[in-house]
Amino acid sequence: MSSPSISILLPTYNYARFLPEAIESVLAQDWPDFELLISDDRSTDGSAAILASYAARDSRIRCHLQPVNLGMVANWNWCLGQARGEYVKFLFGDDRLESPRALRSLRDALAQHPSASLAASARSILNAESALVGLWDEFQDAGLHSGPTVIQRCLRETRNLIGEPSVTLFRRRDAARGFDPRYRQLVDLEFWFHLLEQGDFVYLPEPLCSFRRHTAQQSEQHAIAEVGKWELFELFAASRARAAQQGQSWPAHQFLPLYHHLTHHCRQTATPPPAMQSLRQELAAEIPPLHYAAFRARRHLRSLAHGIRRRLSAAPGTAPA
């Protein structure tokens, strides 16, 4: 059996309500050379019957019902281990491909840029009723970008500018390590950094995929439980250490927002992890006090200005600014 050019990996757990929408969006693609590998992690909502029906209709669909519940990250890695394509695209059971050109566009982006190890696009936001409620385009800079530069930008801005797995495409050869199970909330961002340490990043501003926001998401549950509270700082420390090993300097003053958040978390937590206290002390020793004081003053002024604008726009008879 010849290998497909793209492996679409769909890990799912209790998403029977959304699965048909996700699968139909794959079958509607204008790039037909793919396999759709679906791994159901012991769902209890009738997902198995839906998957069996689709697998019987299209030979490109392979479904596997896990004998035991693997958990989110282990299920992602199981899918990676089964992929046969040159390129890999994740699509979660509650998301969908928004454009019939999604596979072709992302694949072409990597094929046209051999130095790139990761491609992503803007994404539309769906609610639980499948209505489009927004657009996320945080990266806002189309084209090819240096991997290390993108890593540093995400850390400086303290957010995932790349997006969720459903909006990305990467080469299977670069992903042999898999997702790091030590991470939960930022497991995808850590993996993007792993790929970007191997190559460049291509960004497409068209919303090729859709990401759904609803309270049943595991990522939403993790956020509510603050599972990932310290993960950004752990990721920063690990990335900075690897950069230093390669002779790259990451001056602490370039990451003042991250240092500010770390300081806040340490002060608000009765017993911060020792590694986080050490990281805060290390960064504090490198940042001139006046530099940090100026940052805090600017932050305070921006907050005041934002509050004034909100009050003015809410005042009766006042047009929003």
Where in this protein do the model-derived segments appear?
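C-terminal subregions of glycosyltransferases and related glycan-biosynthesis enzymes
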Residues: R156-N160, Q185, E190, E197, ...
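Conserved donor NDP-sugar-binding/catalytic core segment of glycosyltransferases
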Residues: P100-L135
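A conserved acidic beta->alpha catalytic loop
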Residues: D40-A49, V68, F92
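Conserved nucleotide-sugar donor-binding catalytic segment
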Residues: G81, S121-R123, L135, F139-F233
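Cell-envelope/extracellular polymer assembly enzymes that use nucleotide-activated donors
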Residues: P4-S7, E35, E190
